[in-house]
Amino acid sequence: MALKKVTLADKYDLTQDRIFVTGYQALVRMCLVQKERDRRAGLNTAGYITGYRGSPLGGLDYQFQRAESALKPNDIFFQPGLNEDLAATALWGSQQAELRGEGKFDGVFGIWYGKGPGVDRSGDVFRHANFAGTSKHGGVLALMGEDHTAES
């Protein structure tokens, strides 16, 4: 019996049914899967991932940067924030991009990541974004890695 050919690129190849990934890589793949689900539903969406590189989830940015060749052709963009507050504000803006029907995309799905103190800092943005909601074909996943002593 011949062994199956496996490459490092398999983790982001949606035609592969069995892959081995880390948790961070699973989040990257999740964005590719969301884009494909939207495409099959007749939607032209984009992805926007942002957060604070100093968070306990700091390895997440590294995975998104490494996967740029798979993400960019699928209109999925990673842009680190200067801090959690600015990243959250930018992501909130992505949910308003097609508010009046003038956007380039039908919607933008997004991920925000930060640490506990950054969640505190970003309370205003979270509150207002929660009241405003997401775009019809968008959505946001907020991830927080705890850092009780704010040392990361």
Sequence positions of predicted segments:
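Thiamine diphosphate
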Residues: 1-152
